[in-house]
A protein has these predicted regions:
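An alpha-helical appendage that flanks or caps ligand/catalytic pockets
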Residues: 110-150, 191-193, 199-307
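Alpha-helix-loop-beta-strand connector modules within alpha/beta enzyme cores
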Residues: 45-65, 69, 118-122, 126, ...
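Active-site-adjacent beta->alpha loops and helix N-cap segments on the catalytic face
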Residues: 41-50, 186-202, 323-325
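Conserved, mostly hydrophobic/aromatic
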Residues: 29, 51, 82, 123, ...
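Short, acidic/polar
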Residues: 13-25, 78, 164-172, 233, ...
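N-terminal beta1-alpha1-beta2 module of alpha/beta enzyme domains
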Residues: 1-62, 158
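Active-site mouth loops of central-metabolism enzymes
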Residues: 3-16, 65-72, 154-165, 220-221, ...
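Hydrophobic faces of well-ordered beta-strands that scaffold small-molecule active sites
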Residues: 3-9, 33-35, 60-63, 90-94, ...
Length: 331
């Protein structure tokens, strides 16, 4: 294994435990730790700051912040501050969020491609120590710059990545972003269309696919007991089958299974519903869209994602022993 690997943390672990996991991953040669921020449970910025303050080398990314609830100027000031804490180690990951969660909190995700372009352009300009004026569809800035008073005025080295799933957003990512955070719970073959879209976008501005970093979230359930590893991943797979059936279908999940899952799950699905629906999900589906099983099986599956164009697997641990997962991919 010659490729870099990263750790993905959501809210399953206490933040202090997350700090310890970030330190352990750093000691084992991991390239980055990414903190989730898609559900209404844990803000990414606070744990990112905690990880930054307690590590020395590892990169720290947001995986990913939505572009609707944070003003572009505040995004820039937030990531400028994180860069002060860990210079050159911070990655700004942005995404267009998802429904029905966004609509339930009053966000109309209209024109996400235009909004993403405006937010990325404005945030990048501010981080580059530019004075920015925009009167756009979503972003409105009137001669705005980061208001440094007590520190050196300098451009901040914070690359911007987009967590894209749809092919139009993927193409935009190839055009405007430093990297694409490829989605999880997809089969490696799903990457073919994603990379084609990235390449189309890159070509618009004279770039190639090689100019775009392509880390990918990979659900990773490792256990010396193979069945225990599969069972640990099954509930998340089931929930995602109900929430994102179009992506699952594109990855090769049979429509009949998606229909059966949809008959059981409401939104938001209750734990009992997910448990009931999980009994419909065979081991083959779990293995198709996750890296689950023994350490050797998991390494082989992650190799498939890299062969399909992922530049750095971002490993999302599901089994109880996160240290075992980190050890499995230690550099």
């Amino acid at each position: 294994m010659t490729y870099p690997v990263a750790l993905y943390l959501q809210d399953a672990h206490d933040i202090r435990h997350g700090i310890e996991l970030a330190q352990y991953a750093e000691a084992k040669g991991f390239d980055a730790v990414w903190q989730a921020d898609s559900r209404l449970v844990r803000d990414a910025v606070v744990p990112m700051a905690a990880f930054a303050a307690n590590t020395d080398r590892i990169k720290i990314g947001s995986g990913v912040l939505d572009i609707w609830t944070r003003n572009a100027a505040r995004l820039a000031s937030t990531f400028s501050t994180l860069d002060d804490l860990a210079p050159g180690r911070i990655i700004c990951g942005l995404g267009a969020w998802w429904d029905p969660l966004a609509s339930k909190v009053g966000i109309d995700r209209a024109r996400p491609l235009k909004v993403m372009r405006e937010v990325v352009d404005a945030t990048r300009g501010l981080l580059a120590n530019e004075t920015v004026t925009v009167d756009g569809y979503h972003v409105h800035l009137d001669v705005v710059e980061l208001d440094y008073v007590y520190q050196e005025r300098r451009a901040k080295d914070v690359p911007i990545y987009i967590g894209a799933t749809g092919m139009q957003m993927m193409e935009l990512t190839g055009e405007i972003a430093d990297g694409a955070v490829l989605n999880y719970l997809v089969s490696p073959s799903y990457n073919i269309g994603a990379l084609e879209a990235l390449a189309r976008g890159a070509a618009k501005v004279g770039r190639t696919l090689d100019d775009i970093d392509r880390p990918q979230l990979v659900v990773c359930s490792v256990d010396d007991d193979r069945q225990a590893a599969l069972d640990a991943a099954r509930l998340l797979v089931t929930q995602y089958l109900g929430q994102q059936p179009h992506i699952m279908k594109a990855s090769g999940v049979p429509q009949e299974l998606l229909d059966q899952i949809g008959e059981v799950l409401t939104w938001p699905a209750t734990h009992d519903q997910v448990v009931a629906a999980s009994k419909l999900v065979p081991d083959e589906i779990v293995q198709m869209i996750t890296a689950s099983g023994t350490p050797d099986e998991v390494r082989a599956k992650v190799d498939e994602y890299v062969a399909a164009g992922c530049t750095c697997p971002i490993l999302y641990p599901l089994a109880d022993d996160v240290h075992l997962m980190i050890d499995t991919f230690a550099r």
